[in-house]
From Swiss-Prot:
The active site is at C68, H107, D122. It is found in: Cytoplasm. It is an enzyme of class 2 (transferase). The gene is NAT2. This is Arylamine N-acetyltransferase 2. InterPro entries: Arylamine_N-AcTrfase, Arylamine_NAT_domain_sf, Papain-like_cys_pep_sf.
Length: 290
C-alpha cells in the first residue's frame, strides 16, 4: 500500500510533515469529498471486506467508497502512516425509528491526539451528520460547522455526539413527509467510549450487518458524498441534495426519483463510481436520514 496513492485518490497535495490540526482537518475534508460513504457492494451480490489490503484496493485503486468500518480504517492507516497519534474507538448509533442506540458496537471512529489535546475524527457518518472538521473532545461545548452545530457530552465515561440542525426547506412538496428527512432539530447521532479498539473487535459486527435480517444495511442501499456546499445522498432510487445554510439559517433540500438507468448515470457522474455489476436499489426503513 502506498500513502501517495491514497493522497492522489483524495486529491490531497498539501503538507504531510506538519502533524497539526490544520493538516488533520485538511486530510479529513479531502477524504469526505472524494470517498463516498456507501454500501453498494451488498446490493450487487458482493461482500463488504474488512481487511485493510482489500479496503485499499477497493477505495484507492478501484475508486469506490465504503461504510465506516472501511473508510475510517483507511483514514486510520493514513494518519498513523504519516505520524499522527491515532486510536480506534467503537460507537453505537442512534436509531430514530425505535428511539434508542444500537445494542451492538456498529461504528468505528477515531481519536487523534495533537499537542496533548484529543479530537474525534470520523469520515464515516455520511449524509448531513458527517463532520467536516475534527471535534475537540470537550463535554458540553457547541462546535459549529458548516453542516450543523455538533456537541459532545460526557456522562459517567460515555460520550454522546449530538447535532443541532437548521430548518430545512423542501423544494419537492411530495417529499415533505419522506422517511429520509430528519424529524428533529436536535438529533442524537451516536455514543462511544474512549476504550481503545482494534479492527478485530469489529469482525463479528461486519458479518452481522451483512447477514442479519434485522440489519438496516440489508434493506437500504445508500451512497453519500460531501461537496463544498452540501451533501448528495442516493438511497434506493431517491437522489437528494442538501445545500447547507442556503439562506436565513435554512438548508435547501432537493429530491428526485430516478429510473434504473439514471441511478447508474448518477453514480458515475456525481459519485464517480462504476460498479461493473447489477445494483438492486433498496429504499430502507427510515434508519438512515439525509
Amino acid at each position: 500500500m502506498d500513502i501517495e496513492a491514497y493522497f492522489e485518490r483524495i486529491g490531497y497535495k498539501n503538507s504531510r510533515n506538519k502533524l497539526d490540526l490544520e493538516t488533520l482537518t485538511d486530510i479529513l475534508e479531502h477524504q469526505i469529498r472524494a470517498v463516498p460513504f456507501e454500501n453498494l457492494n451488498m446490493h450487487c451480490g458482493q461482500a463488504m471486506e474488512l481487511g485493510l489490503e482489500a479496503i485499499f484496493d477497493h477505495i484507492v485503486r478501484r475508486n469506490r467508497g465504503g461504510w465506516c468500518l472501511q473508510v475510517n480504517q483507511l483514514l486510520y492507516w493514513a494518519l498513523t502512516t504519516i505520524g499522527f497519534q491515532t486510536t480506534m474507538l467503537g460507537g453505537y448509533f442512534y436509531i430514530p425509528p425505535v428511539n434508542k442506540y444500537s445494542t451492538g458496537m456498529v461504528h468505528l471512529l477515531l481519536q487523534v491526539t495533537i499537542d496533548g489535546r484529543n479530537y474525534i475524527v470520523d469520515a464515516g457518518s455520511g449524509s448531513s451528520s458527517q463532520m467536516w472538521q475534527p471535534l475537540e473532545l470537550i463535554s458540553g461545548k457547541d462546535q459549529p460547522q458548516v453542516p450543523c452545530i455538533f456537541c459532545l457530552t460526557e456522562e459517567r465515561g460515555i460520550w454522546y455526539l449530538d447535532q443541532i440542525r437548521r430548518e430545512q426547506y423542501i423544494t419537492n412538496k411530495e417529499f415533505l413527509n419522506s422517511h429520509l428527512l430528519p424529524k428533529k432539530k436536535h438529533q442524537k447521532i451516536y455514543l462511544f467510549t474512549l476504550e481503545p479498539r482494534t479492527i478485530e473487535d469489529f469482525e463479528s459486527m461486519n458479518t452481522y450487518l451483512q447477514t442479519s435480517p434485522t440489519s438496516s444495511f440489508i434493506t437500504t442501499s445508500f451512497c453519500s458524498l460531501q461537496t463544498p456546499e452540501g451533501v448528495y445522498c442516493l438511497v434506493g432510487f431517491i437522489l437528494t441534495y442538501r445545500k447547507f445554510n442556503y439562506k436565513d439559517n435554512t438548508d435547501l433540500v432537493e429530491f428526485k426519483t430516478l429510473t434504473e438507468e439514471e441511478v447508474e448515470e448518477v453514480l458515475r457522474n456525481i459519485f464517480k463510481i462504476s460498479l461493473g455489476r447489477n445494483l438492486v436499489p433498496k429504499p430502507g426503513d427510515g434508519s438512515l436520514t439525509i
